[in-house]
Amino acid sequence: MKKRLLLNLLFCSLFTYPSSCKKYIQHQEENALINLVTSGTWRVSRYQDHQTDITASFTGYVFQFRSNGTVDGVIGAQTTAGTWSADVNARTIQSDFPNADDPLKKLNYTWKVTDSYSDSVSARTLVDSVYNFLELHKN
C-alpha cells in the first residue's frame, strides 16, 4: 500500500511540476513586464493611422502606467484617466481611455507588440483592414 501511494505521489509530482513551473515562469514574466511599464513615464514617438503620420498630435502627452491597471494621459494640467492590460503570451497590450477625444481615443485598441526593449515598445493594430502603428519611448 505504501509503495502504491509513493508511486502515485511521484507520478502526480512529475506531471504537475512542469505545469506549475510554466505558470511560475509566466507569472515572473508578467511581473517583469508590469515593473518595466510602471516605472517611469512614456511618450508616443510614432503613431501612423492607416497611411497618415499623426505623431505630432501626441506632442506634449506623457503616460503614466500603474500596476493596478490604470493609466493617465497627461498634457499640461489636463489628465485623462484610462485602463491598460497586457498579455505576455499573446504579446499584446490593451488600452482604453473611455472619455477621451482625439488623439487619446486612437489608443483604444488591443495592440500586438512587434518589438520591445527596456525603453521602447513598437506595436500594431488592425483597424478597418489596415494596420495602425504605435511606438512608445520611456522618458
Name the predicted role of every residue range:
Residues 22-85, 89-139:
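Lipid interaction determinants
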Residues 1-21:
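Sec-dependent bacterial lipoprotein signal peptides
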